[in-house]
């Protein structure tokens, strides 16, 4: 802990419940307070997700970096695509280093001009609609690959500076209208409090 800013967080979605650690005493407290914590260096810089699609041989077909401009509860509320060669190179390096197949998203922060990876997820990211809207239809290309079709490299083929904003909306119903709404039972995983 000495000399390095750290944080402790529970294993969860979106870093919810993360705590900055400023001393050995705080570290001891959070190690006792948080079940199975992840302790890592605290990274202060712009956050990015890099959406990657790898073919069956692990070759990256598409790499699309996105800046996570506004994040709420671990989910992107506002973001934009960025044609940043440094981030595209990070995607290439991850694909070379790991045996990846299919969709992958890499989370990183740029600190002092250097991208630092803090997470690699072998799945679609929550912000994949922005990547698709920018012209990188990764789900469609994944289907084509699954059907045995060859998909050529699409790296760099997306609209730079495509913005997305998400929002919640409230729906107001009177008693008669709510009576017509059928209740939805939560899936077993949601009932246990796991991320969907």
Give residue ranges: language-model regions.
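A long amphipathic alpha-helix within ATP-dependent nucleotide-binding catalytic cores
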Residues: 34, 72-112, 117, 121, ...
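Short acidic-glycine loop/turn motifs at beta-strand connectors
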Residues: 54-59, 110-113, 148
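Anionic group-transfer/hydrolysis microenvironments
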Residues: 10, 42-43, 53, 68, ...
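Short, glycine/charged-rich beta-strand-loop motifs at protein surfaces that mediate ligand recognition
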Residues: 126-132, 149, 153-154
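Active-site nucleotide/adenylate-binding loops and adjacent lid/helix of ATP-dependent enzymes
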Residues: 4-46, 55-59, 85
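Peripheral (often C-terminal) accessory segments that flank ATP-dependent C-N-forming ligase machineries
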Residues: 140-196
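A short beta-strand motif that forms the metal-chelation/ATP-contact edge
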Residues: 52, 62-65, 114-124
């Amino acid at each position: 802990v000495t000399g390095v800013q750290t944080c402790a967080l529970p294993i969860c979605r979106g870093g919810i419940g993360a705590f900055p650690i400023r001393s050995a005493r705080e570290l001891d407290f959070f190690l006792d307070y948080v079940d199975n914590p992840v302790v890592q260096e605290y990274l202060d810089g712009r956050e990015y997700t890099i959406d990657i699609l790898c073919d069956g041989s692990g070759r990256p077909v598409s790499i699309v970096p996105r800046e996570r401009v506004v994040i709420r509860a671990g989910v992107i509320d506002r973001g934009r695509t960025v044609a940043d060669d440094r981030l595209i190179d990070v995607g290439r390096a991850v694909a070379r280093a790991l045996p990846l197949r299919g969709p992958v998203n890499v989370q990183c922060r740029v600190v002092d001009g250097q991208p630092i990876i803090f997470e690699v997820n072998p799945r679609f990211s929550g912000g994949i609609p922005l990547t698709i809207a920018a012209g990188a239809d990764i789900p469609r290309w994944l289907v084509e690959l699954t059907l045995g079709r060859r998909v050529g490299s699409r790296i760099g083929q997306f609209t730079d500076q495509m913005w997305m904003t998400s929002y919640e909306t409230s729906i107001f119903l009177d008693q008669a209208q709510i009576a017509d709404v059928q209740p939805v039972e939560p899936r077993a995983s949601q009932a246990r409090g796991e991320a969907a």
